[in-house]
């Protein structure tokens, strides 16, 4: 027997005395009993050397798709080292920016260049991207600072106003936007006007958007908000509707999560949505947890402890396994991409493992 989606954290549902829509969940459904991770035959480690030099590879925030027989990985690059700033390049192009690399085997990656979007303000960095294929297009949702003219009374400062941008591509490299306006800005009762770490996924006729933000007014605790748009819409600023109006739908509550939940990434397996997420800030020992949902909206922790912790002392990820990006290949095999660092000096690189969901 089907049951309706229950949404406990939005005034909209309470105000009308009903749910927002009927979910596809079934009474009694349960998540898998075990999630197992397997290393690839060769360790995948990727770092971009463009900005810090050959001795300091760096990459964060991975997201991966497969397109025309090739794998595309999108990620964040840090600002240029002072001694490596290119000449005759606008200052804003030396800041944090999104990068692109390609591979044929998920292990060996070649840098293609930076994310560039025709039609969007040139100062948008397209950082911490979420890239998905749907509607016959490749869609990117990423964060940027350029939000001139946006009313944001709860931004901690105009310079740190983070909003989400959207663009599409046919080939995975050249992106276009039909507007010079951001796609989403957080407007709720509990957070700053801040949205980073976008994740989009489909639930019925809705496209769901998860984002990380910080509580108002201190901005010390990172939590997750959720919005939805009609599937097939333009996914612009007029299309998204906040669900987490009164409170976050997910926040740090376990000791290892400390004061931060961020980087949600979602996959559906056998009628269950699994959300992998990062707990604790990057300057701490970030690790990866999992929550699950029967309706794609209300999520419960699958385990109280991290399912993918940082590595042992002396390993490349001894101080972090964080910012997950889930990817399902054409053959159904699921991979978890993630960032890691060996020290607290920010020496981030990217890797991946196979994921097995076991009943």
Where are these regions (language model features)?
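Bacterial N-terminal signal peptides that target proteins for export
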Residues: 3-13
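Bacterial N-terminal signal peptides
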Residues: 12-21
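Beta-rich carbohydrate-recognition and catalytic domains
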Residues: 27-126, 132-193, 201-259, 267-317, ...
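Active-site/pore-lining binding-face segments in mid-to-C-terminal subdomains
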Residues: 263
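A short, acidic, amphipathic alpha-helical segment used as a generic capping/interface helix at domain edges
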Residues: 320-326
